[in-house]
């Protein structure tokens, strides 16, 4: 209805503009579509525009002057009356498709602009009115381009306690670029729209969900606690599950569902596990309540989850991302090591346990890998965990190869009044010795950030077997630390044999330093000959590797397939609420 209404107004505008151009000021060349038809009095328009801008607040004045002073205060929209309606139509068409990006068209206020511009008479212009129309159109255009290029929300404002990646914002260079030439409007509108593969994949998913939003399906009844539907069994919910999977295409449609899927058969299991892989659910041979909860989620809800993650993809860090970088999706508890757009490594991670120990969203440069690190225990762990443990397990400190210091002098654990420690009184430092039992494992990855968060190995590998891995105090434990360390080393040209040999020897020294066998002939020969091989304590990374700890509940997998995961930190709701109320 809105689109039809806007089309009707635009038809009227087009007629008015055409009539004004044909009759105004005797422009005989107007029949030639290449000719330019100017406003009857450009000087009067310029003055009206200056007056209108002067009435705005300081921030808006600054932006408008950045736009119009380089143009000599001439119109961006009405500089050529032959093309004015065409440009407005082009802008309106783009706005009408904003739901393809998860943004409501109503946010831009285009309907109000069209209503206002439909009353313009360009034969005898009311220049203050024309100046107002100019700015209204400019506001819509700027809102669209800046939102698509940089996002419609500032995540640091939206998540003040969780998000600490400063993102890019529109600057004067951006303003100049989108207003540099009014004849290239379509180019600027297109350029503002993200085009990377992940964004386009999520757009396609959004489109599918838009088509399914009105689909109604029978909810699958929740099972009693500790109950599941096992493969090969008959259950009343099995045909209901089958119908739900047919809607989203994991299962081919059949009319006689009740008879074909009376039993939880292999075909249904295969389709169900495709669904579970998409939603990062545990893949097994039974149906439990977590799977049922995901199947029962309505398509409207899923639509807004995708829309929220499209917005996240529009947020770009202010600082440059190195070509080789590490991306941790805290939501999915997964790390990807990337070179450009190519994923070279994927591994599981353990992230902070909500709500008290959430891993913050951060940007930093990894500058070193520490081998066989010691662990200085955070105060919060000393006060809230170790002090309590020591009251009933006095050997805990010595058994875990920890030392206690006060004023840099080592003290015995029994000398510490553990029960008295609090946020007001905690003068002790607890350090765990390096080695295989150290909580940081054998490798620690330091990157610049204000929270002393780092990536590290662990002495407890069992956590990586768990589906849910929100278990740490905020730092990120990595499943394959040695592979990550080798990825972060300085790149070497494979055609340079000498450099490749140096790199291989460095990798061998890292292996040897953390207690693993050497693999190069040079390394093995040195050990066989009894030569001393110096163990490394740290490896400096130059020029450094970008680390991004980010949060995405909808993303693409290694093969480009769209996946979802549980919103463990409950960060979707604020963003979705903002998108729904964006006006």
Protein language model regions, located:
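Bacterial N-terminal signal peptides that target proteins for export
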Residues: 1-9
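Well-ordered beta-sheet/strand-loop patches within structured domains
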Residues: 2, 20-65, 69-70, 142, ...
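Cationic-aromatic interfacial patches
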Residues: 22-168
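Bacterial N-terminal signal peptides
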Residues: 8-18
């Amino acid at each position: 209805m809105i689109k039809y209404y806007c089309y009707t107004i635009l038809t009227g505008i087009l007629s008015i503009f055409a009539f004004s151009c044909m009759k105004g000021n005797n422009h005989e060349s107007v029949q030639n579509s290449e000719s330019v038809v100017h406003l009857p009095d450009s000087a009067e328009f310029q003055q009206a525009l200056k007056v209108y801008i002067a009435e705005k607040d300081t921030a808006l004045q600054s932006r408008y002057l950045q736009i119009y002073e380089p143009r000599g205060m001439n119109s961006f929209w009405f500089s050529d009356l032959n093309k004015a309606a065409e440009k407005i139509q082009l802008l309106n068409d783009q706005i009408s498709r904003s739901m393809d990006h998860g943004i409501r068209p109503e946010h831009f206020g285009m309907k109000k602009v069209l209503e206002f511009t439909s009353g313009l008479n360009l034969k005898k212009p009311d220049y203050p009115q024309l100046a107002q129309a100019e700015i209204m159109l400019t506001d819509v255009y700027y809102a669209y381009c800046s939102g698509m290029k940089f996002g419609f929300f500032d995540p640091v404002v939206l998540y003040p306690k969780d998000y600490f990646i400063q993102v890019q914002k529109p600057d004067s260079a951006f303003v100049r670029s989108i207003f540099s030439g009014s004849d290239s409007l379509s180019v600027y509108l297109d350029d503002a729209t993200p085009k990377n593969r992940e964004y386009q994949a999520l757009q396609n998913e959004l489109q599918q969900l838009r088509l399914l939003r009105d689909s109604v399906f029978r909810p699958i009844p929740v099972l009693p606690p500790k109950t599941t539907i096992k493969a090969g069994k008959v259950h009343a919910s099995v045909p209901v599950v089958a119908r739900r999977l047919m809607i989203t295409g994991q299962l081919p449609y059949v009319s006689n569902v009740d008879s074909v899927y009376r039993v939880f058969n292999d075909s249904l299991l295969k389709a169900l596990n495709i669904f579970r892989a998409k939603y990062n659910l545990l893949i097994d041979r039974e149906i439990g309540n977590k799977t049922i909860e995901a199947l029962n989620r309505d398509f409207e809800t899923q639509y807004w989850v995708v829309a929220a993650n499209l917005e996240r993809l529009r947020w770009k860090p202010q600082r440059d991302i190195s070509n080789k970088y590490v991306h941790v999706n805290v939501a999915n508890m997964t790390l990807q090591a990337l070179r450009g757009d190519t994923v070279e490594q994927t591994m599981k991670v353990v992230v902070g346990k909500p709500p008290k120990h959430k891993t913050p969203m951060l940007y930093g440069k990894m500058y070193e890998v520490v081998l066989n690190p010691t662990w200085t225990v955070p105060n919060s762990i000393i006060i809230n965990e170790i002090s309590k443990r020591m009251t009933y397990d006095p050997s805990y400190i010595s058994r875990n190869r920890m030392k206690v210091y006060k004023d840099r002098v080592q003290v015995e654990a029994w000398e510490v009044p553990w029960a008295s420690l609090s946020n007001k009184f905690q003068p002790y430092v607890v350090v765990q010795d390096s080695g295989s039992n150290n909580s940081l494992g054998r490798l620690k990855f330091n990157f610049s950030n204000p929270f002393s968060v780092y990536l590290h190995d662990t002495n407890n590998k069992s956590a990586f077997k768990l589906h849910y891995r929100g278990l740490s105090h905020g730092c990120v434990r990595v499943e394959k630390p040695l592979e990550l360390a080798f990825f972060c080393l300085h790149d070497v040209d494979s055609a340079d044999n000498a450099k490749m040999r140096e790199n291989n020897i460095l990798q061998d020294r890292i292996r040897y330093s953390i207690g693993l066998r050497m693999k190069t002939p040079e390394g093995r020969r040195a050990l066989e000959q009894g030569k001393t091989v110096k163990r490394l304590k740290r490896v400096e990374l130059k020029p450094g590797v970008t680390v991004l700890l980010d949060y995405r509940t909808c993303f693409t997998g290694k093969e480009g397939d769209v996946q979802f995961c549980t919103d463990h930190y409950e960060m979707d709701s604020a963003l979705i609420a903002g998108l729904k109320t964006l006006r």
